[in-house]
Amino acid sequence: MIEADRLIAADNPTFREEDVIDRAIRPKKLDDYQGQDHVRGQMEIFIKAAQMREEALDHLLIFGPPGLGKTTLANIVANEMGVNIRTTSGPVLEKAGDLAALLTNLEENDILFIDEIHRLSPMVEEVLYPAMEDYQLDIMIGEGPAARSIKIDLPPFTLIGATTRAGSLTSPLRDRFGIVQRLEYYKVEDLQHIVQRSADCLNLSMESEGALEVARRARGTPRIANRLLRRVRDYAEVMSDGNISSDIADKALNMLDVDVRGFDYMDRKLLLAIMEKFDGGPVGLDNIAAAIGEERDTIEDVIEPYLIQQGYLQRTPRGRIVSDRAYLHFGIDKPDK
């Protein structure tokens, strides 16, 4: 798997030791939340309305690509509502009892945040339905003919679910969310503000042009922007006086093999393989996987989304095709067909 080795992977387990820094630079209030203007505007209204009625916020589903701030938004909602938040993830909730234990410990108007909610087991989902709809738990006691169902009343609460795959949610679960928010890739100017704010939180000396250079190469993703910032900081401290200028940021990012479009080695390897080995496509995913020595799931879930979103790669019924933009980026003449 390449994901653990990619500096620009939006979800990279090798960088979990820096979670403490991530938490320090995460915004705590909607006023500090950069970008996603449509989401921020709507959530301000929904939160104020719930506070005026002195009731729990409606259940909220947040979906979008990795690294765009789903967990951050969930914590901001809890801070704005002035309530506690309990955090878990779909794969962790293996049994109905795991979910029941969390729900019965919630206080009135608290938030339960389930990351990767699309990975909940059907058994756990069945327990979640009445909890979301009626604030009740239906628990089976005993086995066989002696089994019986008991109902446990729950305090009003808010479930916030986060997923990168909204289409994988079952319809009954998806329909129980009263608020659904999609997070989009960030504009460069919004990412520049995020990078500058993170630099200020870390007490770094950073010029606005340096922040812009990092933002340009962050693939529209705050998590990647903050990760690149930390590596640029390392370069600036060792190779210069610690100040992050545009020139220092450019040299650091080039050293990290992140080009002006935010592409890394694997992005370029995939595009070049299609251009040089398959005449630009169409080519099937299995052939690409064999050509670059990578698993098809990793290509589909990790490498391709940004290339497609930026218009360098297309998925067609006949296979993958690189666009004219890709040929221009690499300075390669497009073959006549």
UniProtKB/Swiss-Prot annotation:
Catalytic reactions of this protein: ATP + H2O = ADP + phosphate + H(+)
Region Small ATPAse domain (RuvB-S), annotated ranges: 187-257
InterPro entries: AAA+_ATPase, AAA_lid_4, DNA_helicase_Holl-junc_RuvB, P-loop_NTPase, RuvB-like_N, RuvB_C, WH-like_DNA-bd_sf, WH_DNA-bd_sf
One BP annotation, GO: DNA recombination
Span list, region Large ATPase domain (RuvB-L): 4-186
A GO CC annotation given for this chain: Holliday junction resolvase complex
TM region(s), chain numbering: none
Subcellular location: Cytoplasm
Residues bound to DNA: R296, R315, R320
Amino acids binding Mg(2+): T71
Superkingdom of this protein's organism: Bacteria
Enzyme nomenclature, EC number: 3.6.4.-
Region annotation (Head domain (RuvB-H)) ranges: 260-337
Binding-site positions, ATP: I25, R26, G67, K70, T71, T72, E133, D134, Y135, R176, Y186, R223
Signal peptide feature range: none
Molecular function GO terms recorded: ATP binding; ATP hydrolysis activity; four-way junction DNA binding; four-way junction helicase activity
Cited function: The RuvA-RuvB-RuvC complex processes Holliday junction (HJ) DNA during genetic recombination and DNA repair, while the RuvA-RuvB complex plays an important role in the rescue of blocked DNA replication forks via replication fork reversal (RFR). RuvA specifically binds to HJ cruciform DNA, conferring on it an open structure. The RuvB hexamer acts as an ATP-dependent pump, pulling dsDNA into and through the RuvAB complex. RuvB forms 2 homohexamers on either side of HJ DNA bound by 1 or 2 RuvA tetramers; 4 subunits per hexamer contact DNA at a time.
UniProt comment concerning the protein's domains: Has 3 domains, the large (RuvB-L) and small ATPase (RuvB-S) domains and the C-terminal head (RuvB-H) domain. The head domain binds DNA, while the ATPase domains jointly bind ATP, ADP or are empty depending on the state of the subunit in the translocation cycle. During a single DNA translocation step the structure of each domain remains the same, but their relative positions change.
Quaternary assembly: Homohexamer. Forms an RuvA(8)-RuvB(12)-Holliday junction (HJ) complex. HJ DNA is sandwiched between 2 RuvA tetramers; dsDNA enters through RuvA and exits via RuvB. An RuvB hexamer assembles on each DNA strand where it exits the tetramer. Each RuvB hexamer is contacted by two RuvA subunits (via domain III) on 2 adjacent RuvB subunits; this complex drives branch migration. In the full resolvosome a probable DNA-RuvA(4)-RuvB(12)-RuvC(2) complex forms which resolves the HJ.
Family per record: Belongs to the RuvB family.
Protein name: Holliday junction branch migration complex subunit RuvB
Source organism of the structure: Aliivibrio fischeri (strain MJ11) (Vibrio fischeri)
